[in-house]
């Protein structure tokens, strides 16, 4: 092994001491998380004993000695999978707020950039993964960083001198990705300061990564990891790095989860992987490979002076870094209902397949065959040598106990049949169902709000800081624009060029509350009808109300579907113009009435008689109409 200089030894010592401080608490967390993951996956000890056998007949023969059903009722799974889609079903709607004068004109540009970045990484799916980790383990971890990636690309291009003929281009290196990203970090590979209860007051965190030999070589070739190939003063070479091995076997961390998923983990193997410890303290980052080589050291990669990690805890416990998962409070109830249902299944098996006591001197065991059209020849009374052992019936109290366990699970988790969408029939009134759904909705809203404040808002600040730090040239973004009703292309788009100057200023990030929740389509349709009715009120802006109603109906860019209104000329301007040209206003109003009368279809007479008269004379003269209130242009 190469001899490290004093500076490298100091870096290695900092990370090594931090790792040793964090490992005991993290090992305790992993042991608890293994149990929670087995409950989430519906894993039983019987399956664990059965999995290693290549031929499962051996396992079956051993199980026959101690028979019994091994049922697993997936309450933990249904609880987690009921909450997570109600928390995150859509991408968040970010709100960028200016905090100084320089940011006043730039917050719109920053929002366009952040929305484009989050869309290209499927941000809502990342939030689901982080949220699910929090619901299962009590801790979900996110990370923000700037990702730069180059790849080899081949594209079609016009042949030289032949513009109508295309051919493949020469493979060229292109920038495939150059933007801020948010990632999910496996809680099993995230270690923290044991004296902290949040990232904000942690002295450090360590992100453990597993790398293959090809990944290590690529990082050295790109100059990210140090070696003599890119730094002549470095004491180690790429060959030294590839010859190292991880101190912690990845299989030791993953075996319990792989076993819960049904994979064979009993075979002896050596993981040909490298273990990287990425140390962050908010001021610098140090990466140590295989607990031996400090391959990277530099300033904090975040745009902020903070640790670029975020944690989500669905239920926060004061003074503790890890919160309470959704599985932890109901795990003993899960074990209890598994046992109860398995015992009931065993009782049914005993009732269907009776146990007999027989006289072994009178009956050959091979003659004891049960089935349709079966008979055993005997000499004498069969009751003298064959007697069915009585099996007591299962008490009805077991069903009441099962319902009590289910009620306890639902009361603890807040997830009941009405919340899951199960038809309750006539057992529940409509008001009762609404009250249950409202109570569960408040609990889920609280967990979603914690996800917004702990993950989305914090990562939004990181996105702003990273963009202000790493975007150094002008970039083009396509954004929807207000379409022209006279054009057929809806939706309409425009290209916006945004550079570093258009992103400057002190900004804050907020998220529209509940924007990640699933849309209530029936409620939106009902609200849309209300907006359509309000648009008929002359006191309100009908166009804005129509646009809002179409938006609730799910129409993209509804402005393009609203016909432009004819502008109205104020009555005072019309009257002033008529007086200027010497025309009485009531004469102009009479002329408008005549124009409307000639264009309108004739109305039928009510009784066929002449028009009404004033006494016996001609039709009465009508007083001049009032001055017009407005004339369409």
What are these regions (language model features)?
Residues 90-95, 142:
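Helix-loop-helix transmembrane hairpins and adjacent membrane-interface loops
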Residues 320-323:
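Long, internal scaffold/assembly segments composed of regular secondary structure
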Residues 96-119, 222-225, 229-234, 243-244:
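Charged, compositionally biased non-catalytic regions
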Residues 142, 273, 310-317, 544-549:
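Small/polar, repeat-rich beta-turn/loop motifs that tile beta-strand-dominated architectures
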Residues 287, 296-310:
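Hydrophobic/aromatic interaction determinants used to assemble and anchor large protein complexes
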Residues 116-124, 149:
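A conserved hydrophobic secondary-structure block that centers on an alpha-helix together
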Residues 124-129, 393-395:
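Short alpha-helical segments and helix-capping/turn motifs at coil-helix boundaries
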Residues 1-59, 134, 142-179, 183, ...:
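C-terminal anchoring/interaction modules
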